[in-house]
Swiss-Prot record:
E.C. designation(s): 7.1.1.-
Reactions mediated catalytically: a quinone + NADH + 5 H(+)(in) = a quinol + NAD(+) + 4 H(+)(out)
Membrane topology: Multi-pass membrane protein
InterPro entries noted in UniProt: NADH-Q_OxRdtase_suN/2 (IPR010096), ND/Mrp_TM (IPR001750)
A GO term from the CC aspect: plasma membrane
Major enzyme class: translocase
Its job: NDH-1 shuttles electrons from NADH, via FMN and iron-sulfur (Fe-S) centers, to quinones in the respiratory chain. The immediate electron acceptor for the enzyme in this species is believed to be ubiquinone. Couples the redox reaction to proton translocation (for every two electrons transferred, four hydrogen ions are translocated across the cytoplasmic membrane), and thus conserves the redox energy in a proton gradient.
Gene name, Swiss-Prot/TrEMBL: nuoN
Subcellular location: Cell inner membrane
Transmembrane portions of the chain: 8-28, 35-55, 71-91, 105-125, 127-147, 159-179, 203-223, 235-255, 271-291, 297-317, 326-346, 373-393, 408-430, 455-475
GO molecular function, one term: NADH:ubiquinone reductase (non-electrogenic) activity
Superkingdom as given in the UniProt entry: Bacteria
Protein name stated in the entry: NADH-quinone oxidoreductase subunit N
Family, per entry: Belongs to the complex I subunit 2 family.
């Protein structure tokens, strides 16, 4: 097929981030300069974000057989780019105290962003696999970036081995689907699945194996065992990327697959996904109750958040509101996670050994960093789904979609899970206002609010509050991205 200027405009974010990767690579080869490479990375990601406006003017189109650029792709590309930008911003002060190679961090984040953008635009199982590998491989290096620390290295090895196993399941599942349907394109799969083929054992086995592979990447129960260890072992800025960009991109492509190929029409698939969602919500929240490490706590809570999103995915066949629910929920989850991990990153910067991730490190934070404590409180309330925050709007949408699709047992799980979640989120919030210990351990810089990371954290808190009270701009944006059939 011929590539026209229109196609090139549609691919602008991908091309800009790809070009930034090359420029940063050459810059590192030419001369090591931490500030220069960080600046180049941030400029590239900002340019890719701005280019989405031009992509919107070009309209929806199939750029290649592997990729479709439309409102849906633009929304998820934007969320991935925002998460990558925040990761680079949080990483800069952290890397200032890091004695080994600093510049490669940005290179790995950019390559992973490239994978996220590819996933957001994927319209074919080959693009799905390429995107997942492109996002996973840099993460192996990023998770083990503080490799002189035993915990970081252990987390990296764990994630690498388990990720390789999950990828093999995913690939084998795709092979079985291809063997039965003779197609890998989402659209063609949808057509071939239309005539009662979903009862074929080979096809069900293929989708089952794909659910195993994707369930690992999304850290859904029972494929979640790596999550708390990796979140705790990885540097705080990397945990930010892992919790946001990686999950959002992969969930976006799963959403598109389910939209084109009506896999959810199969009762067997719906039951399996329902059990996974139920287990993820209940188990994720129960395990978070006993955590005293804030990164482990956020790791377990991310399992339950993906469980809530799975409820909307199961309800996808019952109306377009599901897509809207997922878009709003993911935006709320992104800003809340950026704020929470941003506070941990600020407290842990510059690099001086292990991160400030113990709950004890945050005890009495309000008495010497009141604004930072207020930001953390807002993020915890949003993740818990308290009214007047963006997290509540997302959770309300998920409940509405569940009720609309008559998924009563999953609606009950969401309500019970939210009640359990309220306890441990408030436990973190309350500890910020207790009496500070005599000898505080780690602390954020005095003028943290004037640093780039501090500004990102404050903007996240502001968006969570403003969009929680007045969500219409976000809902309108998500509705624009919804019609893609």
């Amino acid at each position: 097929m011929t590539i026209t200027p229109q196609h090139l405009i549609a691919l602008l974010p991908l091309l800009i981030v790809g070009l930034t990767v090359v420029v940063v690579m050459l810059s590192i080869a030419w001369r090591r300069n931490h500030f220069l490479n960080a600046t180049l990375s941030v400029i590239g990601l900002n340019a890719a974000l701005v280019s989405l406006w031009f992509v919107g003017q070009a309209g929806a189109m199939d750029v290649t057989p592997l990729m479709r650029v439309d409102g849906f792709a633009m929304l998820y590309t934007g969320l991935v780019l925002l998460a990558s930008l925040a990761t680079c911003t949080f990483a800069y002060p952290w890397l200032e105290g890091y004695n080994d190679n600093q510049e490669e961090f940005y290179l790995l984040v950019l390559i992973a962003s490239l994978g996220g953008i590819l996933l957001a635009n994927a319209n074919h199982l080959a693009a799905l696999f390429l995107g997942i590998e492109l996002i996973s491989l840099p993460l192996f290096g990023l998770i083990g970036y503080a490799f002189r620390q035993k915990r970081s290295l252990e987390a990296s090895i764990k994630y690498t081995i388990l990720s390789a196993a999950a990828s093999s399941f995913l690939l084998f599942g795709m092979a079985l689907v291809y063997a039965q349907s003779g197609n890998l394109s989402f659209e063609a799969l949808g057509k071939s699945l239309g005539d009662g083929m979903l009862r074929e054992p080979l096809l069900l086995a293929g989708f089952g194996l794909m659910i195993v592979g994707l369930g690992f990447k999304l850290s859904l129960v029972p494929f979640h065992l790596w999550t708390p260890d990796v979140y705790q072992g990885a540097p705080a800025p990397v945990s930010t990327f892992l919790a946001t960009a990686s999950k959002i991109a992969i969930f976006g492509v799963v959403m598109r697959l389910f939209l084109y190929a009506p896999v959810g029409d199969s009762e067997a698939v719906r039951v399996v996904l329902g059990i996974i969602a139920f287990a993820s919500i209940i188990f994720g929240n129960l395990m978070a109750l006993s955590q005293t490490n804030i990164k482990r706590l956020l790791g377990y809570s991310s399992i339950s958040h993906l469980g809530y999103l799975l409820v909307a995915l199961i309800a996808l066949q019952s109306g377009e509101m599901s897509m809207e629910a997922v878009g709003v929920y993911l935006a709320g989850y992104l800003f809340s996670s950026l704020g929470a991990f941003g506070v941990v990153s600020l407290m842990s910067s510059p690099f001086r050994g292990p991160d400030a991730d113990s709950l004890f490190s945050y005890r009495g934070l309000f008495w010497h960093r009141p604004v930072l404590a207020a930001v953390m409180t807002v993020m915890m309330l949003s993740l818990a789904g308290i009214p007047m925050t963006l997290g509540f709007i997302g959770k309300f949408y998920v409940l509405a979609v569940g009720v609309q699709a008559s998924l009563w047992w999953l609606v009950a799980a969401v309500v019970v899970g939210s009640a359990i979640g309220l306890y441990y989120y408030l436990r973190v919030a309350v500890s910020l206002y207790l009496h500070a210990p005599q000898q505080p351990g780690r602390d954020a810089p005095i003028n943290w609010q004037y640093s780039a990371g501090g500004i990102v954290v404050l903007i996240s808190a502001l968006l969570v509050l403003v969009l929680g009270v007045w969500p219409q701009p976000l809902i309108s944006l998500v509705q624009l991205a919804t019609p893609l059939m």
